[in-house]
Amino acid sequence: MSHVELQPGFDFQQAGKEVLAIERECLAELDQYINQNFTLACEKMFWCKGKVVVMGMGKSGHIGRKMAATFASTGTPSFFVHPGEAAHGDLGMVTPQDVVIAISNSGESSEITALIPVLKRLHIPLICITGRPESSMARAADVHLCVKVAKEACPLGLAPTSSTTATLVMGDALAVALLKARGFTAEDFALSHPGGALGRKLLLRVNDIMHTGDEIPHVKKTASLRDALLEVTRKNLGMTVICDDNMMIEGIFTDGDLRRVFDMGVDVRQLSIADVMTPGGIRVRPGILAVEALNLMQSRHITSVMVADGDHLLGVLHMHDLLRAGVV
């Protein structure tokens, strides 16, 4: 395209709003196609013993990739196969236990229609999503989902806009309906998203990130305050646990306790840790979620917490550990 000048006063915002208005109308019309065929499609996908295989060419292929990704992350195992590659060997990835979803707005994609006889021969259920109920793909499908739109948002009527939005929304409707039918939970979602923020919050446990062994700051009850302070600075967690030879907790001493000692105006050189420690102390179990420990620490306004089985010290968790793990 040759260079053109921007028309004086051209309103980009108005052009954008017109697109939204057109696509809103098209989505409102889509409601009529959530019908018995939609139920049949969901049932085939729900009872599928294999995977949901999504196919599409061009823009429909891009929508198909997103659709497959949404299915896979919401409890419906799925993957995308390019129809052109399927015709040259990749169809071997599809089994009779699978369900195929084929996408084409015209319903006449030659790359897909060429595959239909093979899919039929293998008795693979075929769900077609098209904008034309009378198309070849719609007629060949076991279930046809219509995504017909009145007009594209593109003023030329050429670039797939409203039609791709309608197809994407139909895919979301399938995915969420199946999610609800399966009783899919946030914890299930986290299992397929371990690297995401939600995954870290719902999967990471205290014992995954707590300090253990030699990293635990601890002294005996007979230690001087000076020795306890040295332990605090060596382990750099802003606290030390007071425990016996069997790592049974007797108390805790934090940097906040140290400030209170100085406010007392006493000679710190003459004090033992037993004189100034806080008996007992807040502790959490090692198996709880890290986000639960975070909530406790925030509610109690503390930056570190003991990890214990009853009174038996197992580790220490600091707010910095939660930050590094991405829980905060």
From Swiss-Prot:
UniProt keyword annotations, A-Z: Carbohydrate metabolism, CBS domain, Isomerase, Lipopolysaccharide biosynthesis, Metal-binding, Repeat, Zinc
Reactions accelerated catalytically: D-arabinose 5-phosphate = D-ribulose 5-phosphate
Binding site residues for Zn(2+): H82
Every CBS domain range: 210-268, 277-328
Binding residues annotated for substrate, in chain numbering: 75-76, 82, 88, 114-123, 148-150, 222, 275
Pfam families attached to this UniProt entry: CBS, SIS
Record InterPro entries: CBS_dom, CBS_dom_sf, GutQ/KpsF_isomerases, KdsD/KpsF-type, SIS_dom, SIS_dom_sf, SIS_Kpsf
GO biological process: lipopolysaccharide biosynthetic process
Signal peptide: none
Enzyme class: isomerase
Functional pathway: Carbohydrate biosynthesis; 3-deoxy-D-manno-octulosonate biosynthesis; 3-deoxy-D-manno-octulosonate from D-ribulose 5-phosphate: step 1/3; Bacterial outer membrane biogenesis; lipopolysaccharide biosynthesis
EC annotation from Swiss-Prot or TrEMBL: 5.3.1.13
Feature type site, description Catalytically relevant: K59, E111, E152, H193
Molecular function GO terms recorded: arabinose-5-phosphate isomerase activity; carbohydrate derivative binding; metal ion binding
Ranges where the SIS domain occurs: 42-184
NCBIfam families linked: kpsF (TIGR00393), PRK10892.1 (NF008141)
PANTHER family recorded: ARABINOSE 5-PHOSPHATE ISOMERASE KDSD, PTHR42745
The protein's assembly and partners: Homotetramer.
Family to which the UniProt record says this protein belongs: Belongs to the SIS family. GutQ/KpsF subfamily.
Its job: Involved in the biosynthesis of 3-deoxy-D-manno-octulosonate (KDO), a unique 8-carbon sugar component of lipopolysaccharides (LPSs). Catalyzes the reversible aldol-ketol isomerization between D-ribulose 5-phosphate (Ru5P) and D-arabinose 5-phosphate (A5P).
Protein name: Arabinose 5-phosphate isomerase KdsD
